[in-house]
Amino acid sequence: MMKHMFWFCSATLALLAAAPARAQAVPNPGERVESLITFGAQSDKQWGDDDFAQTFFFLIPERQRTPVYIRVWDPDCGGKNDDLKGAANTTTSFSLYGGPGTFSGPQARDPRPTNPVPTGRLLKSQTFGSEPQYDGKWYTFGPLNPLEGEPVDEFKGRVFKLVARGLTGNDGNLYRYFFSTSPTENVSVEGGNAFTYEYCFRLPATASKTTVHLYPFVNDKVVSIKQSNYDVDNAATLSVFSIAKNGQPGTMSGDGEWTSSVFPIANKEHGLSLDFRLTSTKPAPNDLVFYVTDQYDTALPFFAIPLGGRPRYQYDIGVKIHR
């Protein structure tokens, strides 16, 4: 369904602009997303997960030669942080891939792939059920040799892929990641980043109002984008901000349904991130799915650290000179 395109020089320039950022928490604190979520395979899709799988890519700068680690917070499903629908009965696998095809393989970046088998070389897979020793604790993949990641020229780095998949059960597994240079602490990989092409996450509950931020990146070939979202329950609004957009509204979905809306892209938005602001006043948490495609139906990435920095609207101020 999706066609894959290279991003040419704009992605590289934006990545270099973002390099000083050091926090590789996923979700990143600046996004204000509560947690990632993946439901068990027997779950009702109306609970907010369309395919019971989630893929994240982790980018290592080309200069990195020391080992890196991908840490998973609360990987089990059955504790106080998870969405249990009764007695805990859910297993979740976390599978790590590297090498050729990890990023470039068929449908590797497709948010709704017809072939669910991940591409790349499987480095390690770990399955978790209800395991108290991991409740609210960290599990670490690694050490990872940076040279085991697939080279991605347009990023000037190498990429690993971590796929979370709900295997059995009907509970929601809430978890987070951290890209680290330490197996026991969260120490950021300088110049690293993480990104996904389909984001399944939890909007936090609020007593008044809360806003989360998603940062899709726009390469220099994009003329228009289509945002697609699933199961928002008509419980949030979407406003799009960028250097050229000052809160343009987007369409949001109802319960158990997909919806979408299209936005034109200005030339000055190329090589920068957009700021999708989702605002909710719902007193209960809400799980949902988001992805963005361009005019060719090619998926665009959401970066944890927005490439080019957080976008800010640029006002056009006309100045008249009186002689």
Locations of regions flagged by a protein language model:
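Bacterial N-terminal signal peptides
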Residues: 8-17
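Sec/Tat signal peptide C-region and signal peptidase I cleavage site
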Residues: 19-23
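N-terminal leader/pro-regions and domain N-caps
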Residues: 24-48
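Extracellular beta-rich ligand/substrate-recognition surface
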Residues: 42-53, 200-206
